[in-house]
């Protein structure tokens, strides 16, 4: 194996890990040669009401696309995360919660969490929520967010969690698509010392003329500050819970019954409702949580992701709780009020496993390692990274400053669509290279293909595809199976196209090189460029806009917008700021353009297609080798854009 920056598995980790290198190779081989037998065995890791006999029926043919796992079995996700732990672990901590203000602390045992979930499940039923209904959830990072998700799962309702940073328009589009009758929110969230007007955002979203489905809004009092109240529609969380019974028989769900919807940015504009089902998802989330993080009974596990993202679903709620872990939930941001907060929380709660994002690591790096002078960190055993590829220098900083060079780093690659981790080191099995996601998880068959779909062998670079299904895979785009086929299976026939490019080195390790489609990864969160462009063009002074990602020291990728103004509109710094605020209001703070360059014209082909590769290179300040511009209708546009670019390094 090439030794360039190779970090060997620590011997004490290898000796005690669930999986060592020899076992990984044996299990991986079995998982791809005999997936039926492999998953028949590992499907038993969760509790089934009616055991499955059929394991796998999947087709990646875009004309006959179907994905079914454990499909004649029945179960309930809430029972797997709660009830099955009660006999031995009712008094074990399920959730440790720390508020934005470190003085705010709460804990819930598995017994207490079970009671809360049963009560809220009954409360939902009292408001007419039935099996198969979509419930929209717009909550802060409080234990009640997990309660809501598990209560929905208990009664067979489908939760659709919307990230608390999204705008009213974004909420409205998700409510409309899911036809939600019930929305659950809080008066306000608290994050980084600021209050987030969650209820006000919901009110604005529901005032949208196309939102006609919502009958009830359940409001948790988080801050207690006064909020607008709609009589007959709005109900206080506390008043529902006062009268709700603590006993709730769980619905028996088919393995392929929907568990949740999570909307993700598409390159075509409208967000896609990614649908995950119950059986395969839970098997995969719990198995990857145990093996990728080498989770051991009694450990404290902290995933810093927001519940509004897939990482919060799979590795803050379902995976860890199915495994009976104690999870830490933090309401705020791990570098507030000072960058030392992350270390303080690790020490305060004796965290053993930390799962966070490169964007936070880079932000902490920028503050300097002396911020961690008072940090002990001796409880930490395993550290993970998620959301985007981590650059090697951030990896090394994380390893040295947070992990004290003792903790293996699992740099995990996966997507909303995959349900769980697909490519990652295993702590006791995989020597790591900073910046590489390394090897596939069990049952996952990655490949690289060229633009014609031909598989490329050996050390190479290409489009990353997956050749066969795995249990955690999404099943469809909600209400639009054709879009599911078109987005993921038509580009390269018979394969799942990830939308990412990757490089495979001579050791067979995978290095993710980033999106190859029109999606930007900002601080580990995906945004469709079409969404941002649509928001800009909706402004009265904008004639045309093109949006690309560019390298950003903190966020990984920043948003660079080229804007052509309407005739007669004057370019000004005031207008630039107005447009930034406009996008922020239309989509959310995450989508705010970092740089807006005025563009008299955009590079287009004669058929009118914008040539984004030129725009990406100019935004990245790579202006010496732009490639062939002969297909452009007006090549002179390029020179002007280079001349007026904003991201130049002097």
UniProtKB/Swiss-Prot annotation:
CoA binds at residues 191-194, 311, 335, 523, 584. The modification N6-acetyllysine is found at residue 609. Its EC number is 6.2.1.1. PROSITE patterns: AMP_BINDING. SUPFAM superfamilies: Acetyl-CoA synthetase-like. This is Acetyl-coenzyme A synthetase. The keyword Magnesium applies. The lineage of its organism: Bacteria, Pseudomonadati, Pseudomonadota, Gammaproteobacteria, Alteromonadales. ATP binds at residues 387-389, 411-416, 500, 515, 526. It comes from Shewanella loihica (strain ATCC BAA-1088 / PV-4). It is an enzyme of class 6 (ligase). Acetylated. Deacetylation by the SIR2-homolog deacetylase activates the enzyme. Keywords: Acetylation, ATP-binding, Ligase, Magnesium, Metal-binding, Nucleotide-binding. Its cofactor is Mg(2+). The keyword Acetylation applies. It catalyses: acetate + ATP + CoA = acetyl-CoA + AMP + diphosphate. GO terms for molecular function: acetate-CoA ligase activity; AMP binding; ATP binding; metal ion binding.
């Amino acid at each position: 194996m090439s030794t360039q920056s190779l970090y060997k598995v620590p011997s004490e980790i290898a000796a005690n890990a669930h999986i060592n290198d020899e076992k990984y190779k044996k299990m991986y081989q079995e998982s791809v040669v005999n997936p039926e037998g492999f998953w028949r065995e590992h499907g038993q890791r969760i509790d089934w009401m009616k055991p499955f006999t059929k394991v796998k029926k999947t087709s990646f043919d875009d004309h006959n696309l179907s994905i079914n796992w454990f499909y004649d079995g029945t179960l309930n996700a809430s029972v797997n995360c709660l009830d099955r732990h009660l006999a031995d672990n009712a008094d074990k901590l399920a959730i440790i919660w720390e508020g934005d203000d470190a003085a705010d602390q709460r804990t819930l045992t598995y017994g207490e969490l079970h009671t809360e979930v049963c009560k809220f499940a009954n409360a939902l039923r009292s408001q007419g929520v039935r099996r198969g209904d979509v419930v929209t959830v717009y909550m802060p990072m409080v234990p009640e967010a997990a309660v809501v998700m598990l209560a929905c799962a208990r009664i067979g309702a489908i939760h659709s969690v919307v990230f608390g940073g999204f705008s009213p328009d974004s909420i409205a589009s998700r409510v409309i698509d899911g036809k939600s009758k019930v929305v659950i929110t809080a008066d306000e969230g608290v994050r980084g010392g600021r209050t987030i007007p969650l209820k006000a955002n919901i009110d604005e979203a529901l005032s949208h003329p196309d939102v006609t489905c919502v009958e009830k809004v359940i409001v948790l009092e988080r801050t207690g500050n006064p909020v607008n109240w709609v009589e007959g529609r709005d109900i206080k969380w506390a008043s529902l819970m006062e009268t709700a019974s603590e006993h709730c028989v769980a619905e028996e769900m088919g393995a392929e019954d929907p568990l949740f919807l999570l909307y993700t940015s598409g390159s075509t504009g409208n967000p896609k409702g990614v649908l995950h089902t119950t059986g395969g998802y839970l098997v995969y989330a719990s198995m990857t949580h145990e093996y990728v993080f080498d989770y051991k009974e009694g450990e404290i596990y902290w995933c810093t992701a927001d519940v509004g993202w897939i990482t919060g679903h799979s590795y803050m709620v379902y995976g860890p709780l199915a495994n009976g872990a104690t999870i830490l939930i933090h309401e705020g941001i791990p570098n507030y009020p000072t960058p030392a907060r992350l270390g303080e929380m690790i020490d305060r709660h004796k965290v053993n496993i930390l799962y966070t994002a490169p964007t936070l690591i880079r932000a902490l790096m920028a503050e300097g390692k002396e911020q961690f002078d008072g940090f002990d960190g001796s409880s930490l055993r395993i550290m993970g990274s998620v959301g985007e590829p981590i650059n090697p220098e951030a990896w090394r900083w994380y390893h040295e400053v947070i992990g004290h060079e003792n903790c293996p780093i699992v740099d995990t690659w996966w997507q909303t669509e995959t349900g769980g981790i697909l490519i990652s080191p295993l702590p006791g099995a995989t020597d790591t290279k900073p910046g590489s996601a390394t090897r596939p998880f069990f049952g996952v068959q990655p490949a690289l293909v060229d633009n014609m779909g031909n598989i490329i062998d050996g050390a190479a670079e290409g489009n990353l595809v997956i050749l066969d299904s795995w249990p955690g895979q999404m099943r469809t785009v909600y209400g639009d199976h054709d879009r599911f086929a078109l987005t993921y299976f038509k580009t390269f026939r018979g394969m799942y196209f990830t939308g990412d490019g990757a490089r495979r080195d001579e050791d067979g390790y995978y290095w993710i090189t980033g999106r190859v489609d029109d999606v930007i990864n900002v601080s580990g969160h995906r945004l469709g460029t079409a969404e941002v462009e649509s928001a800009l063009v909706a402004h009265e002074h904008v004639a045309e806009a093109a949006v690309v990602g560019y390298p950003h020291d903190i966020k990984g990728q920043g948003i660079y917008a080229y804007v052509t103004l309407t005739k007669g509109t004057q370019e000004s710094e005031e207008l630039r700021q107005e447009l930034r605020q406009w996008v922020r209001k239309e989509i959310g703070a995450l989508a705010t353009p970092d740089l807006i360059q005025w563009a008299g014209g955009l590079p287009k082909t004669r058929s009118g297609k914008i040539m984004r590769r030129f725009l990406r290179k100019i935004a990245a300040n790579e202006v010496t080798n732009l490639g062939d511009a002969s297909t452009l209708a007006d090549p002179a546009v390029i020179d002007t854009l280079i001349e007026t670019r904003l991201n130049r390094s002097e």
